[in-house]
From Swiss-Prot:
Belongs to the neurotoxin 14 (magi-1) family. 05 (ICK-7) subfamily. ICK-7 sub-subfamily. It is found in: Secreted. Expressed by the venom gland. Residues 1-18 form the signal peptide. Residues 19-77 form a propeptide. Keywords: Cleavage on pair of basic residues, Disulfide bond, Ion channel impairing toxin, Knottin, Secreted, Signal, Toxin. One of its GO terms (cellular component) is extracellular region. The presence of a 'disulfide through disulfide knot' structurally defines this protein as a knottin. This is U9-barytoxin-Tl1a.
Amino acid sequence: MNTMITFLVLFVLTAANGAPEANERKIPEAIHNEDQSLAEMAEELMFFLQQTEFEAPLLQEEEEAEXAEXRNSRERRCAMGDVPCTKGKTNCCKGYECKPKSPAWWYDTDFCQSIHSGRPIGI
């Protein structure tokens, strides 16, 4: 344990005091290279921003067209069996039609009923 602590202290002292002249020479070159790379990155960023400003309205128009297609192609909600409906405005699903439930007077509205017996075709 004492050996490890000794080597650790020696390493810290060497790193702190070792060859400061070599590090001082490299710093200005690194700063100069960073300045050049930052300038190049700034130019590339400006070019990219100009491209995106040009393409943004085109992409927005495409998204609006896709949203309009999806909105128009969406299937409307429909009513299945034994759901009240009106004769003039049918909201019954495919395979159902708006018919009176029975000839009884207490059913004042019509209901969606299956055209065929069993499960309707197409659903």
